């Protein structure tokens, strides 16, 4: 299911939508550090990232064609989490990820709010 974010109106359907992205300088420094110290670097991708963030605004969507509830064909669905296509999806995902990493004792970078680090013994998680 994909929301029709193009129909959303700023100030009415959504407020803050800015979501920080990794600074290129942070990526360069990380890669230089890994290369200099001959370390292994692992990368991950969260495929359903935009489906995990809780939504703070009230958003209703129509029932998708072919999936209408036969008892209530004219009803709409109230969203509890963001969907692909909503303007607030990137920010909701960032906030969800940030809260999770902070609970796991990661620290937010001072110059880059997308840089989270955690040191455990000799290991550094970035």
Place the predicted regions along the sequence by residue.
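Long, low-complexity, charge-biased intrinsically disordered regions
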Residues: 1-126
């Amino acid at each position: 299911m994909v929301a029709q974010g193009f129909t959303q109106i700023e100030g009415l359907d959504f407020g803050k939508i800015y979501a920080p992205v990794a600074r290129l300088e942070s990526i360069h420094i990380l890669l230089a550090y890994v290369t200099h110290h001959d370390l292994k670097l692992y990368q991950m991708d969260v495929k359903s990232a935009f489906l995990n963030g809780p939504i703070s605004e009230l958003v209703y969507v129509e029932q998708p064609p072919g999936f209408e509830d036969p008892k209530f064909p004219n009803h709409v669905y109230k969203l509890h989490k963001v969907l692909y296509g909503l303007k607030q999806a990137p920010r909701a995902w960032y906030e969800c990820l940030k809260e999770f990493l902070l609970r796991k004792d990661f620290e937010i970078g001072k110059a880059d709010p997308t840089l989270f680090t955690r040191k455990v013994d000799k290991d550094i998680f970035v």
